[in-house]
């Protein structure tokens, strides 16, 4: 057994000993009272509200006012006369007043452990140091904690354990709680932003018979009653566009997508996506709307449009750079010429040399995108709209009027990561059918991320879809930016993990 394994074994033995002691205490509670886990205590205040409401009250003013309160929370520190509680908003001390609390209550308090949840009544007071606290007149145990909290000096520092036991992580790490409060604020602000502009929030199927709307490998399942294969959706796009056909001219959805792909600091198989569509608009309108949304989000969450991330600062207040795929390759790789990019064999050689997985059947447009992904994407630090993607890799986007080999599409990159994907939607049913057929050929040639042929979607387009622009924004990656989080797992409450050995 290695030294590390020995240390782990000793820690586990110590934890088991503490758990056994706590279970003995719970047994004593069960014996002493009929209900060990009561649910009749009702607090009337949160700690943060008390701190804010009475911030300007002096010790003497609080003493004269004798303001009664009922509070509840988890014991995080026990300093003998003072117990530090934590609720969902803040921490606050409660005072164990030996003059007012009954002897039996004082005896019970001595048996309580860190992690236990209590409910207390008392009056507000302020210490000589200026700290607000509750001078308790009564207190009781509401929930006995059977497992010890992480060591107060080291906390829960093992990253993998933080992800596996998010409930403990949230208990002991304020930074984690802040991250997920910000995530909630971001989603709420997006909803408000779009609703104020006339967008209707909708819900579309998670289980689909044909996985469409993105180039990705789906999760497959089986519907027993219908005896048919079904797929967890990789995107809601084709259903949202059906709604535009039906007459809902501005729609959006914030929900989960599922892609049977690798796990990394940027990817989780289950992730949250915003998709929105607006009729009588194009991809340039969406660029303007996206800039406005991102500026408002940064201002609302951070109080500034300068977004710190690691050792960098992203400037959301400045106009986002707009650059085509083709031009971006030339800008960031001066050794590559336009002639190189327009020659299939030369482009294939460049893509291979850059490390792209070239199969040999790719067209020029696909090769250009491969080169972009390998040689440019990671260099796009400040916000960049990369536009005019080749039509081969944009099977749902409208061709550009001036150059039909590319589409009216953009992807937004910040910090070298794709944050959004948008385009003027293809509403020509015949063109869409042809592109689906090209995707089927790609799939037959070995590309398991190529799209299926969706006959019902073609049927919908044949009824006529107005000129439309659509966009998808990855909520998880956006929250990563706004919370300065290095990994997507930091912003997903329960990320997917390999089973523990």
Swiss-Prot record:
| Reactions performed catalytically | tRNA(Lys) + L-lysine + ATP = L-lysyl-tRNA(Lys) + AMP + diphosphate
Which is an annotated GO molecular function term of this record? lysine-tRNA ligase activity
Q: Which Pfam families match?
A: tRNA-synt_2, tRNA_anti-codon
Which terms are listed as keywords in the entry?
Answer: Aminoacyl-tRNA synthetase, ATP-binding, Cytoplasm, Ligase, Magnesium, Metal-binding, Nucleotide-binding, Protein biosynthesis
**Gene name tied to this protein:** lysS
Q: How is the cofactor bound?
A: Binds 3 Mg(2+) ions per subunit.
How does the record describe its quaternary structure? Answer: Homodimer.
Its protein name is Lysine--tRNA ligase
